[in-house]
Amino acid sequence: MMYIVFIMSVLYVVGFIGFSSKPSPVYGGMSLIVSGGLGCGIIMSSGGSFLGLVVFLVYLGGMMVVFGYTIAMATEEYPETWGSNVVVLSAFLVGLLMEIFMIVWLFSGEHELVGFYFGGLEDLVVLGEGSFGYVREDYSGGASLYSYGFWFLAMAGWMLFVSIFIAIEVTRKRY
């Protein structure tokens, strides 16, 4: 099971590398949809089957509508693929090599995978009484996000802030 989740994680990142290398909207939308499906599979394999199903239905359902409209509006006679342009292909390969380097560096044994060590789930007991404790995975995941994962929330907030300016710059009229 661990290998399946690892392969899904690698394909998840490869899909986003494929999207960020700026191919045609047809292939960019396809890579985002595949990455979204793989992300839902990762959530389901981690024990959040209901959350994975809801995200799959809502997120990918909305994405199908948006990308269908985008593809209809931006049809090209000769769509740009990842191998049709040297710049696009090199951006894809550089991103892929960076991911491979990061995986080798993280699994070399010298570094911890997340940057800190979890002693166990005894600190994350949500429902407990006396010596008996019951750990819910989804509640402890939310608690970990706000306690141990504060850097992730700060980075996600910063990325949303920067994406506002990127969207403004892309849609700004040039006279």
From Swiss-Prot:
Its protein name is NADH-ubiquinone oxidoreductase chain 6
Which InterPro entries does the protein's record reference? ComplexI_Subunit6, NADH_UbQ/plastoQ_OxRdtase_su6, Nuo/plastoQ_OxRdtase_6_NuoJ
Q: What does the record give under GO molecular function? A: NADH dehydrogenase (ubiquinone) activity
- Its Enzyme Commission number(s) read 7.1.1.2
Output the Gene Ontology cellular-component terms.
mitochondrial inner membrane
Topology versus the membrane: Multi-pass membrane protein
Q: Which domain of life is it from?
A: Eukaryota
What compartments host this protein? Mitochondrion inner membrane
The UniProt subunit note reads as follows: Core subunit of respiratory chain NADH dehydrogenase (Complex I) which is composed of 45 different subunits.
GO biological process: one example: mitochondrial electron transport, NADH to ubiquinone
User: What Pfam families does its record include?
Assistant: Oxidored_q3
UniProt entry keywords in alphabetical sequence: Electron transport, Extinct organism protein, Membrane, Mitochondrion, Mitochondrion inner membrane, NAD, Respiratory chain, Translocase, Transmembrane, Transmembrane helix, Transport, Ubiquinone
User: Which EC class does it fall in?
Assistant: translocase
The record's similarity note reads: Belongs to the complex I subunit 6 family.
Q: Which organism is it from?
A: Mammuthus primigenius (Siberian woolly mammoth)
| Membrane-spanning parts | 1-21, 24-44, 51-71, 87-107, 113-133, 148-168
Primary site of residence: mitochondrion
For this protein, what reaction is catalysed? Answer: a ubiquinone + NADH + 5 H(+)(in) = a ubiquinol + NAD(+) + 4 H(+)(out)
